[in-house]
């Protein structure tokens, strides 16, 4: 069997690694918005929203509720792990 030589195998900030970190964080703390996740993981909210959309498409998380963000005043999704 050959070793994985892809960039993601060596890059701790790869999209696959970040997607996994987002999923694990949502499993541990289910009442989180993308902004909350970004703050916890030290990332930009735009990088988190892409990963949550991917996880939602995969059926691993779902929007549990919405709340009003105190900073922006916008309605935001609150995520929960499905599996």
Residue ranges and their predicted role:
Residues 1-2, 28, 80-83:
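Short intrinsically disordered terminal tails
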Residues 1-25:
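Short alpha-helical segments that sit at the start of domains
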Residues 12, 62-83:
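Short, cationic-aromatic polyanion-contact patches
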Residues 17-18, 33, 47, 52, ...:
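Ser/Thr-centric signal marking residues that sit
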Residues 24, 39, 50:
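DNA-binding alpha-helical recognition surfaces that contact promoter or target DNA
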Residues 27-33:
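Short capping segments at the starts of secondary-structure elements
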Residues 34-41:
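A short acidic, leucine-rich amphipathic alpha-helix
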Residues 43-57, 68:
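Short amphipathic alpha-helical interaction segments
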